C-alpha cells in the first residue's frame, strides 16, 4: 500500500497548527540558531516552484537544529510595499491594500501546505502600520545622525507617466512601459549617506561566511580606488576643473579634459562660437539613462567647448570637451583624458583627431592604447620611473604646486531614497513655511499612509500623496506656523532593510526590539535567498545595521553571519521559467498529485543547492517512488507496523546505519542535501536486502528523513509507537567503531586464475584463510584430481593455490 499523501499531510499540518509545535520561546539561556529566508513579495501569481527550494533548505536546517537541542528562530513575513501592487491598483481601480491582503492569504496557504516549520506568531508585514512605525523611526535616527538629506539629483523624469523612473526602466530614451519620452531633470530627492559607511561595508566583508563571488560583487559595487585629486586651471578665467584619477603618473599624457554635459562649469566656460552645439548636445544627453551613457559598446560622442585648461605639471594648454560617457554623479564629473594609455580616451581621441602623447613605453600608440606596465617617458621628472614610484612622485609634485593631493574615491553613490509613489512608507518629515524642516515627533508615529482611491501620479513630479490636502497640510499647534508634509514615499528596500530584527520581538510596542532578545538572537546564523539580491538588498541592510550598531541598538556589527544563494530551477528544456513560455510549474499542482514531501525531497535531490537545474517530471516521480518504498518497508497493507521491524540487532545493518548517520549529519552541516538523500536511499536499499531491520535503526532513519519530508516523518514516527511529535526528538548519533568494516573480501586464485571471492573476518590467520579457501566449492572443483604444490596466503588480500 502506498501512503495517502493528501490525508497524511493535512493531518500533520493541522496538528502542528493546533499544538503550535514550532513556536519559538525566548529561552535566553539555551543555545540558539536563527535561520532566515528572504521574505517574498506577495505577487498576484502566488508561489512558484523556485520559492520552496530556498525555503526547504532553511526548513531542513531548522528542524535538524531543533533535534540537536537548539532554540531555533525560523520566521516568515511579507515584503508587501512596492510598484506591482500600485500598478495593479492603477490598472483595476482596486485598493492596493485589498490586493496585497488577498495575495498574502494565497502565499500563506501555499507555504503552510508545504509543511515549513515557521513560527507564525512572529509573522511581519512591511505594510502594517505597527511595522512601518519602526521603519519611520529608523529613518528619523538616520536623519538625526546627519545620514538623511535632501539633494538636487538628476533623475529620469517621464512627464507622460508623471513620475521618476529608475535607470532600468528607461530604454533608448523612452519609458519601458508605454514608450514615453524620458528626460534627465534635476529634482529634489531624499538621499541616504551610505558612502559614509563605505570603508566599513568593505572591510567587514572579510569576517563573513558568504560565497566569495557574492562578496566580490559587493566589493565591485563599492568600488574603492586610491589615486589623486588634480586641479586644472581654466585658461583666461578664475575657474578650475577638478578631476579624480587613479593614474596621476600619466598626467604628462593628459591631452584634453572631458566634462559631463551637466557639469556646473560647462555653461560659463563655453565660448560663444560653440554655445549652440553644446546646448544641443546637453539636450540629447538628458534623454539618456546612465546605463546607456556608459555602455562600452556604444559609439563615442562629444563636443568641444572652445575652452582650454592648463596642465599643472607640463604647463601645456589642453582642450576641454563635454561627452555623455562622463557622468556628473561619479567622481568629480570630469576626467583628464590620457588617450595613449586608456582605451576609451583613445577611441575618443581617434574619432575627433585629438593629440595622443605616449608617456609609458612598451606599446605602439599608433595602433592602440597601451595599458600595460613600463618606464615613463616624455614625463619630465617622472622619466625612467616604473608605475608605483611614478604615482608617488606625481602626487608629491602636485602637492608642492598646490594642484592636487592623494585621495580615495568610491564608485558607490549615496542611496536615492525617495519615490514619487503612493504605495510605500510615508517619510516622516514636515517642511515649514519659514524654510525649516523637522521630523514628525516619535510619539506621533506611525505616520499613517492615508487611504484614497486617487493614487494616480500627480503629474508634478510629486507623489499622489500631494493630491490629499488633509494629509499634506499641517499647522504647528504651538506657533500657528503652516507646513507641508513630505509627499515622497520610501523605496521598497526600506522595509526589507531591518525585518530580520523585528522577527526577534514582533509585538513590542515600545521599541524596535528588546535589547536582551537582540543580544540573544543576533547575528542571523543562516540566510538563504536568490543571488539577485547580492548587492542592493544586502548592502542596504548591512548599512542600516551598522548605523543601528553605532547607535547602540543592535549588538553586532553585521546582520547575517552565513549567507547562501540557492540556484535557479529551470524549465524542462533548460530555459528560465516564465509565463510567456508557458513553462511555469505551480507547486499547488505538485502538492495535489505527488505530495509536499515529494516536492521537498525532489527539489533537494535535484543537485547541489546552489546549481541551476532543469525541472524533470521523471525525477519528481522517482522521489515519490522512494517515499513509497520507505513506507512499504515500515508499514503493512493494513496500516500496522511491519513484522520485519524487530527489537533485536543481528548486526547486519550496523555499518551502513552508522555510515548513514555520519554522512547525513556531515552533509546537513554543509547544505549538501542531495548527497545526504543519496545516502538515505543507500540505507533503504540495504534494508530491503535483509530479513530483519533493527527498530532503533529505522527510528534513526525516520529522524533523518523527517527534516526533508516532515509529514511522512511524523506519520512513520507514530506508526513506530510514539505519541509525541518527532520535532524535538534527539538527532541520531553514530559509533565510530562501527563505521569500519570488520570483514574484508579476499580473492582466491588457482594457478593465477580467479576462482572465488570470499568475505572473511579481518583478523583471520593465514592458516584459517587457507582452510576457508580450500573448502570453497568452486576452488574444490578447480583442484579436483590435482596435487597441491603450494598455498600462499596474504592476510586481508588473497589466497593463491598452485596445483598440478
UniProtKB/Swiss-Prot annotation:
CDD domains, alphabetized: Anticodon_Ia_Leu_BEm, LeuRS_core
Record flagged with keyword Transmembrane: no
A UniProt-annotated Pfam family: tRNA-synt_1
Predominant place of localization: cytoplasm
Motif ('HIGH' region): 40-51
Binding sites annotated in the UniProt record for ATP: 579
Protein keywords: Aminoacyl-tRNA synthetase, ATP-binding, Cytoplasm, Ligase, Nucleotide-binding, Protein biosynthesis
Enzyme Commission (EC) number: 6.1.1.4
InterPro entries: aa-tRNA-synth_I_CS, aa-tRNA-synth_Ia, Leu-tRNA-ligase, Leu_tRNA-synth_edit, M/V/L/I-tRNA-synth_anticd-bd, Methionyl/Leucyl_tRNA_Synth, Rossmann-like_a/b/a_fold, tRNAsynth_Ia_anticodon-bd
Renumbered ranges of motif 'KMSKS' region: 576-580
Reactions that this protein is recorded to catalyse: tRNA(Leu) + L-leucine + ATP = L-leucyl-tRNA(Leu) + AMP + diphosphate
One of the protein's GO biological processes: leucyl-tRNA aminoacylation
Gene Ontology terms, MF aspect: aminoacyl-tRNA deacylase activity; ATP binding; leucine-tRNA ligase activity
EC class of the enzyme, as a word: ligase
SUPFAM superfamilies tied to this protein: Anticodon-binding domain of a subclass of class I aminoacyl-tRNA synthetases, Nucleotidylyl transferase, ValRS/IleRS/LeuRS editing domain
GO cellular component, one term: cytosol
Keyword ATP-binding: yes
Localization per record: Cytoplasm
UniProt family annotation: Belongs to the class-I aminoacyl-tRNA synthetase family.
Protein's name according to its UniProt entry: Leucine--tRNA ligase
Organism: Staphylococcus aureus (strain bovine RF122 / ET3-1)
Gene behind the chain: leuS
Amino acid at each position: 500500500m502506498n501512503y495517502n499523501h493528501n490525508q497524511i499531510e493535512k493531518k500533520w499540518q493541522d496538528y502542528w497548527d493546533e499544538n503550535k509545535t514550532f513556536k519559538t520561546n525566548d529561552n535566553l539561556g539555551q543555545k540558539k540558531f536563527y535561520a532566515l529566508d528572504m521574505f517574498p513579495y506577495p505577487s498576484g501569481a502566488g508561489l512558484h516552484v523556485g520559492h520552496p527550494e530556498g525555503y526547504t533548505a532553511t526548513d531542513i536546517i531548522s528542524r535538524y537544529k531543533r533535534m540537536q537541542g537548539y532554540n531555533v528562530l525560523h520566521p516568515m513575513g511579507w515584503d508587501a510595499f512596492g510598484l506591482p501592487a500600485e500598478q495593479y491598483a492603477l490598472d483595476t481601480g482596486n485598493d492596493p491594500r485589498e490586493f496585497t491582503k488577498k495575495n498574502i492569504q494565497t502565499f500563506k496557504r501555499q507555504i503552510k501546505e508545504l509543511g515549513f516549520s515557521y513560527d507564525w506568531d512572529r509573522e511581519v508585514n512591511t505594510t502594517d502600520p505597527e511595522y512601518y512605525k519602526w521603519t519611520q523611526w529608523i529613518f528619523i535616527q538616520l536623519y538625526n545622525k546627519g545620514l538623511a538629506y535632501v539633494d538636487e539629483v538628476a533623475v529620469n523624469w517621464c512627464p507622460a507617466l508623471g513620475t521618476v523612473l529608475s535607470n532600468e526602466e528607461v530604454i533608448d530614451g523612452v519609458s519601458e512601459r508605454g514608450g514615453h519620452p524620458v528626460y534627465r531633470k534635476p529634482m529634489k530627492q531624499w538621499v541616504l549617506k551610505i558612502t559614509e559607511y563605505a570603508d566599513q561595508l568593505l572591510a567587514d566583508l572579510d569576517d563573513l561566511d558568504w560565497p566569495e563571488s557574492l562578496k566580490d560583487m559587493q566589493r565591485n559595487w563599492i568600488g574603492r580606488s586610491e589615486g589623486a585629486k588634480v586641479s586644472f586651471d581654466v585658461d583666461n578665467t578664475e575657474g578650475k576643473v577638478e578631476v579624480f584619477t587613479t593614474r596621476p603618473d600619466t598626467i604628462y599624457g593628459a591631452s584634453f579634459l572631458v566634462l559631463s554635459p551637466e557639469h556646473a562649469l560647462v555653461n560659463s566656460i563655453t565660448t560663444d562660437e560653440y554655445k549652440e552645439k553644446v546646448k544641443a548636445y546637453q539636450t540629447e544627453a538628458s534623454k539618456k539613462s546612465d546605463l546607456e551613457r556608459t555602455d562600452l559598446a556604444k559609439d563615442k560622442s562629444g563636443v568641444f567647448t572652445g575652452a582650454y585648461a592648463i596642465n599643472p605639471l607640463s604647463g601645456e594648454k589642453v582642450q576641454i570637451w563635454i561627452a555623455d560617457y562622463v557622468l556628473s554623479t561619479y567622481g568629480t564629473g570630469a576626467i583628464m583624458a590620457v588617450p595613449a594609455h586608456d582605451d576609451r580616451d583613445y577611441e575618443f581621441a581617434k574619432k575627433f583627431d585629438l593629440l595622443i602623447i605616449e608617456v609609458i613605453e612598451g606599446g605602439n600608440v599608433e595602433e592602440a592604447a597601451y595599458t600595460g606596465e613600463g618606464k615613463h617617458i616624455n614625463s619630465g621628472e617622472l622619466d625612467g620611473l616604473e608605475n608605483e614610484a611614478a604615482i608617488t612622485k606625481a602626487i608629491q609634485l602636485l602637492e608642492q604646486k598646490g594642484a592636487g593631493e592623494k585621495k580615495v574615491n568610491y564608485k558607490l553613490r549615496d542611496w536615492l531614497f525617495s519615490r514619487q509613489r503612493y504605495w510605500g512608507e510615508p517619510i516622516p518629515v514636515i517642511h515649514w513655511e519659514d524654510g525649516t524642516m523637522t521630523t514628525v515627533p516619535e510619539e506621533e508615529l506611525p505616520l499613517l499612509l492615508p487611504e484614497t482611491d486617487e493614487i494616480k501620479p500627480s503629474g508634478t513630479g510629486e507623489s499622489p500623496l500631494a493630491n490629499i490636502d488633509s494629509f499634506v497640510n499641517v499647522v504647528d499647534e504651538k506657533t500657528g506656523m503652516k507646513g507641508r508634509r513630505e509627499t515622497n514615499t520610501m523605496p521598497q528596500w526600506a522595509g526589507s532593510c531591518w525585518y530580520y530584527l523585528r522577527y526577534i520581538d514582533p509585538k513590542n510596542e515600545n521599541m524596535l526590539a528588546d535589547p536582551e532578545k537582540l543580544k540573544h538572537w543576533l547575528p542571523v546564523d543562516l540566510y538563504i535567498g536568490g543571488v539577485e539580491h547580492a548587492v542592493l538588498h544586502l548592502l542596504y541592510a548591512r548599512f542600516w545595521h551598522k548605523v543601528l550598531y553605532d547607535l547602540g541598538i543592535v549588538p553586532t556589527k553585521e546582520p547575517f553571519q552565513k549567507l547562501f544563494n540557492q540556484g535557479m530551477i529551470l524549465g524542462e528544456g533548460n530555459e528560465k521559467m516564465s509565463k510567456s513560455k508557458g513553462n511555469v510549474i505551480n507547486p499547488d499542482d505538485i502538492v495535489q498529485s505527488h505530495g509536499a514531501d515529494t516536492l521537498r525531497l525532489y527539489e533537494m535531490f535535484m543537485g547541489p543547492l546552489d546549481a541551476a537545474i532543469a525541472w524533470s517530471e521523471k525525477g519528481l516521480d522517482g522521489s515519490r517512488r522512494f517515499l513509497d518504498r520507505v513506507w512499504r518497508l515500515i508499514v503493512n497493507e493494513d496500516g500496522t507496523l511491519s513484522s520485519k521491524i524487530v527489537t533485536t540487532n543481528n548486526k547486519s545493518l550496523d555499518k551502513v546505519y552508522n555510515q548513514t548517520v555520519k554522512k547525513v549529519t556531515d552533509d546537513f552541516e554543509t547544505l549538501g542535501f542531495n548527497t545526504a538523500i543519496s545516502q538515505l536511499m543507500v540505507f533503504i536499499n540495504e534494508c530491503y536486502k535483509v530479513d530483519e531491520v533493527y527498530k532503533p535503526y529505522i527510528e534513526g532513519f525516520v529522524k533523518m528523513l523527517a527534516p526533508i519530508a516532515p509529514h511522512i516523518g511524523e506519520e512513520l514516527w507514530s506508526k513506530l509507537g510514539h505519541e509525541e511529535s518527532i520535532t524535538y526528538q534527539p538527532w541520531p548519533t553514530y559509533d565510530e567503531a562501527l563505521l569500519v568494516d570488520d570483514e574484508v573480501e579476499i580473492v582466491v586464485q588457482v594457478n593465477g586464475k580467479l576462482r572465488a571471492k570470499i568475505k572473511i573476518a579481518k583478523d583471520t590467520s593465514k592458516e584459517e584463510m587457507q582452510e576457508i579457501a580450500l573448502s570453497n566449492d568452486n576452488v574444490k572443483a578447480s583442484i579436483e584430481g590435482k596435487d597441491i604444490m603450494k598455498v600462499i596466503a596474504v592476510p586481508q588480500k588473497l589466497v593463491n593455490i598452485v596445483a598440478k
